[in-house]
């Protein structure tokens, strides 16, 4: 059985509202289109004003938000609360970027920026919006993690660290909200073709970090994630984790079966 995106209350239809960050393209945009088809009122969070206007023209409610800016997150949260009349059903924390390069080339400021966008911003936004969810006894909080939240590889230590943090945070939040009716899920994509690579910061341009060949062969489009996102939002029993792509499944199995040194050799290439 699934939840419907609308409820009948006192003779009126109330549309359930969800906020999606990182909505300008890729996983965020595809998920927004699908949840809109499912009947949700989608608040589409974007970092650039032009993208906010584009979301409005597509039938969404555009919200300007930069997760790297605490002030922007606060303003966006206030706007979402006002737009939903303090009644929000779901949050899809999807925005983020990758800081790639050997750890020896990454400064403290760069590491802080990686965590600010991928982790601290999602924490701040979720905590600001929880009061608009808790009184209603139901809801969904969905996080875009990554296969890099399960493993780390050379050149991706900063990005993986931010996703490891997101995994631990989501596990704790899920247990803390266990009696609230709000369910917490993690989406764990492997290699996905999106504009994410446009937002990758390379710390050594002469030695760029590239997708290994085996990952490139199993890269899927963002639509591969959409079914998982839909299930997380409308199923009465959403999963705690949704692995996406063969690469993620393989990593989960190999981590359980192989000694750490063997995994290191595989991941080092």
From Swiss-Prot:
Quote the CDD domains the UniProt record gives. 17beta-HSD-like_SDR_c
What Gene Ontology terms describe what this protein does at the molecular function level?
alcohol dehydrogenase (NADP+) activity; oxidoreductase activity
Q: What keywords sit in the KW lines?
A: Oxidoreductase
Q: Which InterPro entries match?
A: NAD(P)-bd_dom_sf, Sc_DH/Rdtase_CS, SDR_fam
Note one Pfam family from the annotation: adh_short
Magnesium in keyword set: no
- Name the source's superkingdom: Bacteria
Q: Which GO terms describe its biological process?
A: steroid metabolic process
Binding positions (substrate): 146
Residues binding NADP(+), per UniProt:
15-41
- Report the active site residues: 159
Its Enzyme Commission number(s) read 1.-.-.-
Classification via SMART domains: PKS_KR
Q: Which family does it belong to?
A: Belongs to the short-chain dehydrogenases/reductases (SDR) family.
- Record-linked NCBIfam families: PRK08017.1 (NF005950)
What name goes with this protein?
A: Uncharacterized oxidoreductase YbbO
């Amino acid at each position: 059985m699934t939840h419907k995106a609308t409820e009948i209350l006192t003779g009126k239809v109330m549309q359930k509202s969800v906020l999606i960050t990182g909505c300008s393209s890729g996983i965020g945009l595809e998920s927004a289109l699908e949840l809109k088809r499912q009947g949700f009122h989608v608040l589409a969070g974007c970092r650039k004003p032009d993208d906010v206007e584009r979301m409005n023209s597509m039938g969404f409610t555009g919200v300007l938000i930069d997760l790297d800016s605490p002030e922007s997150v606060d303003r966006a949260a206030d706007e979402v609360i006002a737009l939903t009349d303090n009644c929000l059903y779901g949050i899809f924390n999807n925005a983020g970027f990758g800081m790639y390069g050997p750890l020896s080339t990454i400064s403290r400021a760069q590491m802080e920026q990686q965590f600010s966008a991928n982790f601290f911003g999602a924490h701040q936004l979720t905590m600001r919006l929880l009061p608009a969810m808790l009184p209603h006894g139901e809801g969904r909080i969905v996080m875009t993690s990554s296969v890099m939240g399960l493993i780390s590889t050379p050149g991706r230590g900063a990005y993986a660290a931010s996703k490891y943090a997101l995994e631990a945070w989501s596990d704790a939040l899920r247990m803390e909200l266990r009696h609230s009716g709000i369910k917490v899920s993690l989406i764990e994509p492997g290699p996905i073709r999106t504009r994410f690579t446009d937002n990758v910061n390379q710390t050594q341009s002469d030695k760029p970090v590239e997708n290994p060949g085996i990952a490139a062969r199993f890269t899927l489009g963002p639509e591969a994630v959409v079914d998982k996102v839909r299930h997380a939002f409308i199923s009465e029993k959403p999963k705690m984790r949704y692995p996406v792509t063969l690469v993620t499944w393989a990593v989960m199995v190999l981590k359980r079966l192989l000694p750490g040194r063997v995994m290191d050799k595989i991941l080092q290439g």
